[in-house]
Amino acid sequence: MKVKVFNLEGEPVEEIELPNVFATPFRPDLIRRAVIASWTHRIQPQGRDPLAGKRRVTENIGKGHGMARVERIKTSPRFAAFVPFARGGRRTHPPKVEKIIWEDINKKERRLAIMSAIAATANYDLVRARGHIVDNVPQVPLVVVNDLEKVFKTAQTREIFKKLGVWDDIERAKKNTKIRAGKGKMRGRRYKKAKGPLIVVAKNEGIVQGARNHPGVDVVTVENLGVELLAPGTHPGRLTIWTKGAIERLREIYG
């Protein structure tokens, strides 16, 4: 499939052939598994000391004393110990470090999931169904010249995004930033932020600095491209801007 390459003014300058990876069948099941595997591998195993609450010298005084037959502190028989309902006792069902919390996925399945997520960025219906505003976007996938990689000023990237028709989607991401409900707002996750366009480049020559302050915009090189960036929240079809060099590098890696 041939697509147009746009300059930074939003004008088509040439046509190129897309790599075969954009013809990969749509596999939402594998994409979901790959994203969840990526999520779970960021979780740190936690557990409790196996001897917590058990470091007491206790005795069982037996029956006939008018007291519950639970373990008692040897030097203070009035106070229970060891049992979960006692002060300083063990926990009932503490978390264990042995618990398997990581979801794994085979290497070939993960590679196929990335390829399928890449192909989903070229599906207009999937991009629109994900919530992106693409009314003014000239084409999906949007391919631009390599000069985009050298833009390092936020004001310049803003004008480029407007000329390429993706600024409406960035405004949508800005308006959908909300304060998180619950205690997560106290733990470094105060805001729930919507995802806007993804910029994939062959080489970072300043574009990361120029685009990082725009709400919802992510910049990544082809080598670091992952399924979580292509399908945030397990939902494929993210609006993606590719540079011409990124398309060529994609052809070398995935064919």
Curated annotation (Swiss-Prot):
Keywords: Ribonucleoprotein, Ribosomal protein, RNA-binding, rRNA-binding. Pfam families: Ribosomal_L4. GO terms for cellular component: ribonucleoprotein complex; ribosome. The keyword Nucleotide-binding does not apply. Disulfide bonds: none annotated. It comes from the Archaea. GO terms for biological process: translation. One of its GO terms (molecular function) is rRNA binding. InterPro entries: Ribosomal_uL4, Ribosomal_uL4_dom_sf, Ribosomal_uL4_euk/arc_CS, Ribosomal_uL4_euk/arch, Ribosomall_uL4-arc. The keyword Ribosomal protein applies. Belongs to the universal ribosomal protein uL4 family. One of the primary rRNA binding proteins, this protein initially binds near the 5'-end of the 23S rRNA. It is important during the early stages of 50S assembly. It makes multiple contacts with different domains of the 23S rRNA in the assembled 50S subunit and ribosome. Part of the 50S ribosomal subunit. This is Large ribosomal subunit protein uL4. It comes from Thermococcus onnurineus (strain NA1).
